């Protein structure tokens, strides 16, 4: 595909914009990944290694930016923006998205939002609040630079506007521009994954927007929404944030489900086992995932019956998720092809890691167990197995499988991608599997130092991180 020098700001073609989303995703993701390598270098052994004692807030700033970038600027643009823009019109028989120019604007807002978030590092103390921006830390004028929190909030707002525009575009395209005679009931699992993701974004992003705007007004306009000294409530912010924050996890992983379903179905030359149940399972995941946000807040002093409700609802999500894994495996086992392409291997790796991450999620969903494991490395291990391994493998599966469609030629040979897959998989398993043991040893997250007794597991984690870096260099 030949592009002129102004194509980025003038092109409205959905395929071109989808490719730009992918390029932005890999560019931003590489930056975020290198930040995580800095964190693992610091945690290679106990005591401070590369961060000075008087500048320990730098560690907070790094993991804050790492989290925001990987969630909002790596996985979302790659799977939802890239795969959705490129293939949604094709899969529903449309020649173009409903609003091509709005689609172009939503792409251009992504690098603007990224630059705003990165600018927070230029402030004197940075915005070391964690990606959750919890008050009263984020509204404190003593330990942080208010301007750093400002630009992070504005960056998230700009990114949210871009996501809402894309979501409206996708839903309108499917409802009004699909091919004649193509009913909603016969749309593919991949198409439904993008539709359900778009609906979740439209329902939850306004709540996040309201929450961070209240935070901004607390910082600069003398409101007291989250200040307990004047009858404000910091827990209110947690409710507002996690009402978006937990569905966001499914917003990230549902397009990955669509990619994996499409690749498995195509590679094994058969329709998915239980095709309609796969769509129903995604709908159930979306509904249940939107009403379980309080499981992030078990330690905030909830009543017992509240904990019981959210524990049971959280564990209930494992039923539709298990349905999807079962159907994928049935489709694979009913085929005689075996692993014929690197994307088939990546799909199996996704299923393994996602299943393991989901199992640890069921453990953490239990209110009694979570009180012991809350804010330990067990939590980090859980969500990185689902996101850092699961969603990222789905992103690479997408590029590996569709590379001829995307670029008109095979950029990487099958053998090289298989080699990268194995090296990457071993690296991430070495990085995140020992974190479960660190969590059981109650190593707190977001702290750059730890007892000497935990040196061994942390050393293995850091070696795995380095191995993942080498694997990424092979794929480049």
From Swiss-Prot:
Lipid bilayer topology = Multi-pass membrane protein
Q: Where does Cu cation bind?
A: 246, 295-296
| Keywords tagged on the record | Calcium, Copper, Electron transport, Heme, Iron, Magnesium, Membrane, Metal-binding, Mitochondrion, Mitochondrion inner membrane, Respiratory chain, Translocase, Transmembrane, Transmembrane helix, Transport
- GO BP of this protein: electron transport coupled proton transport; mitochondrial electron transport, cytochrome c to oxygen
Q: Where does Fe(II)-heme a bind?
A: 66, 384
- A GO molecular function for this record? heme binding
Q: Which residues bind Ca(2+)?
A: 42, 448
Q: Which cofactor does it need?
A: heme; Cu cation
Query: Which residues are recorded as binding Mg(2+)?
Result: 374-375
Q: Which reaction does it catalyse?
A: 4 Fe(II)-[cytochrome c] + O2 + 8 H(+)(in) = 4 Fe(III)-[cytochrome c] + 2 H2O + 4 H(+)(out)
Cystine crosslinks: none
Q: Which InterPro entries match?
A: Cyt_c_oxase-like_su1_dom (IPR023616), Cyt_c_oxase-like_su1_sf (IPR036927), Cyt_C_Oxase_1 (IPR000883), Cyt_c_Oxase_su1_BS (IPR023615)
Q: How does this chain assemble?
A: Component of the cytochrome c oxidase (complex IV, CIV), a multisubunit enzyme composed of a catalytic core of 3 subunits and several supernumerary subunits. The complex exists as a monomer or a dimer and forms supercomplexes (SCs) in the inner mitochondrial membrane with ubiquinol-cytochrome c oxidoreductase (cytochrome b-c1 complex, complex III, CIII).
For this entry, the protein name equals: Cytochrome c oxidase subunit 1
Species this protein is from: Plasmodium berghei
Q: Coding gene?
A: COI
């Amino acid at each position: 595909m030949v592009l002129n020098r102004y194509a980025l700001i003038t092109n409205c073609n959905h395929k071109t914009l989808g490719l730009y989303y992918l390029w932005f995703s890999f560019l931003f993701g590489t930056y975020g990944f290198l930040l995580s390598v800095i964190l693992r270098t610091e945690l290679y052994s106990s005591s401070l290694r590369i961060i000075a004692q008087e500048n320990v807030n730098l560690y907070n700033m790094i993991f804050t930016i790492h989290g925001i970038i990987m969630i909002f600027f790596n996985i979302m643009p790659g799977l939802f923006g890239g795969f959705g823009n490129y293939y949604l019109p094709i899969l529903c028989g449309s020649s173009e998205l409903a609003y091509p120019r709005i689609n172009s604007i939503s792409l251009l807002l992504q690098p603007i939002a990224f630059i705003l978030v990165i600018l927070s590092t230029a402030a004197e103390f940075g915005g070391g609040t964690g990606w959750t921006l919890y008050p009263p830390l984020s509204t404190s004028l003593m330990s942080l630079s208010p301007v750093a929190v400002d630009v992070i909030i504005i960056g998230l707002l700009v990114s949210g506007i871009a996501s809402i525009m894309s979501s409206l575009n996708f839903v309108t395209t499917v409802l009004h521009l699909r091919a004649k005679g193509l009913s909603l009931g016969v749309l593919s699992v991949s198409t439904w994954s993008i539709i359900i993701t778009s609906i979740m974004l439209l329902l939850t992003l306004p709540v996040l927007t309201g929450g961070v705007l209240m935070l901004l007004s607390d910082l600069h306009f003398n409101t007291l929404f989250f200040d307990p000294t004047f009858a404000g409530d910091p827990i209110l912010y947690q409710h507002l944030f996690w009402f978006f924050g937990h569905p966001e996890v499914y917003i990230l992983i549902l397009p990955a489900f669509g990619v994996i379903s499409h690749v498995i179905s195509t590679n094994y030359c058969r329709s998915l086992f239980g095709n309609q149940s796969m769509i129903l399972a995604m709908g159930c995941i979306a509904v249940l995932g939107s009403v379980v946000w309080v499981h992030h807040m078990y330690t905030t002093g909830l009543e017992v019956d509240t904990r019981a409700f959210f524990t049971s609802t959280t564990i209930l999500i494992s039923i539709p998720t298990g349905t999807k894994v079962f159907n994928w495996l049935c489709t694979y086992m009913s085929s005689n092809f075996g692993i014929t392409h690197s994307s088939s291997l990546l799909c199996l790796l996704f299923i393994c890691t996602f299943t393991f991450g989901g199992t640890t999620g069921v453990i953490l969903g239990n209110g009694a167990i979570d009180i012991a494991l809350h804010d330990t490395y067990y939590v980090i291990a859980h969500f990185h197995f689902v996101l850092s391994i699961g969603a990222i493998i789905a992103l690479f599966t997408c590029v590996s499988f569709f590379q001829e469609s995307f670029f008109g030629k095979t950029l990487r040979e099958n053998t090289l991608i298989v080699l990268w897959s194995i090296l990457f998989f071993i690296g991430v398993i070495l990085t995140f599997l020992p974190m479960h043991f660190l969590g059981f040893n109650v190593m707190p997250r977001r702290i750059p130092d730890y007892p000497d007794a935990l040196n061994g597991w942390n050393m293995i984690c850091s070696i795995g991180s380095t191995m993942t870096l080498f694997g990424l260099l092979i794929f480049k």
